Amino acid sequence: MEKIFLNGEFVSPSEAKVSYNDRGYVFGDGIYEYIRVYNGKLFTVTEHYERFLRSANEIGLDLNYSVEELIELSRKLVDMNQIETGAIYIQATRGVAERNHSFPTPEVEPAIVAYTKSYDRPYDHLENGVNGVTVEDIRWLRCDIKSLNLLGNVLAKEYAVKYNAVEAIQHRGETVTEGSSSNAYAIKDGVIYTHPINNYILNGITRIVIKKIAEDYNIPFKEETFTVDFLRNADEVIVSSTSAEVTPVIKLDGEPVNDGKVGPITRQLQEGFEKYIESHSI
């Protein structure tokens, strides 16, 4: 029987209930992580939970969990649910309290829930590429925190769906930031460009992996801003995330990227990613 982790216990889905006064439900006052499972093993799990605890610290949320403890509960959940290929979603909120914008006084216990999902890798997208669109980035100014406040992302993703695209690549003015659920890259003249790490983007775990792969393959990797026009005229465009892995974008705003085919640097990064899965899953 499927199990859900809820506030220190492994329970059935029917028992996994939260209060209507949970601050995650009322305010989006919480954080989350999404961790890939390959061959029954957790991929880059340490990096994910280090970011999880950083996000918690940034919003003043003390979870009383170490990285090691979070990894252990994740392993148990994956084993219980017999997940071979899929993911684990975990979120923490500031807990249950009467509705008030300020933090609860006295403090209440955080609410933590985690569940698993079995699903295959996006082979078709990886092999053939996807359509993308560009859209104005209307999100808040702390995108480096992986918070539950995702309305801006949701609206951007829905815009992509409306125009038969898989991802919306966002921009503030003319400066490209990131995708609605991914980091974004423009490849030009053999160089990978992506937005620098700051409060405008999430420091994606797959982004970190791609940077390391680029170093291994001696591909120049520049963390600097670029424009929407630069993106549209790139030789290759990719988006990356835990679920999307290294996905090529072959059409942007209805026009082909370069010749509309998956490019050679994208293929190198995908090759390196396969090796990284083997070496960084535990």
Swiss-Prot record:
GO terms for molecular function: D-alanine-2-oxoglutarate aminotransferase activity; pyridoxal phosphate binding. It catalyses: D-alanine + 2-oxoglutarate = D-glutamate + pyruvate. The keyword Cell inner membrane does not apply. Keywords: Aminotransferase, Pyridoxal phosphate, Transferase. Substrate binds at Y32, R99, H101. InterPro entries: Aminotrans_IV (IPR001544), Aminotrans_IV_CS (IPR018300), Aminotransferase-like (IPR036038), BCAT-like_C (IPR043132), BCAT-like_N (IPR043131), Class-IV_PLP-Dep_Aminotrnsfr (IPR050571), D_amino_transT (IPR005784). The active site is at K146 (proton acceptor). Pyridoxal 5'-phosphate binds at R51, E178. It holds the Pfam family Aminotran_4. PROSITE patterns: AA_TRANSFER_CLASS_4 (PS00770). GO terms for biological process: D-amino acid biosynthetic process; D-amino acid catabolic process. Acts on the D-isomers of alanine, leucine, aspartate, glutamate, aminobutyrate, norvaline and asparagine. The enzyme transfers an amino group from a substrate D-amino acid to the pyridoxal phosphate cofactor to form pyridoxamine and an alpha-keto acid in the first half-reaction. The second half-reaction is the reverse of the first, transferring the amino group from the pyridoxamine to a second alpha-keto acid to form the product D-amino acid via a ping-pong mechanism. This is an important process in the formation of D-alanine and D-glutamate, which are essential bacterial cell wall components. Belongs to the class-IV pyridoxal-phosphate-dependent aminotransferase family. NCBIfam families: D_amino_aminoT. Homodimer. This is D-alanine aminotransferase. The gene is dat.
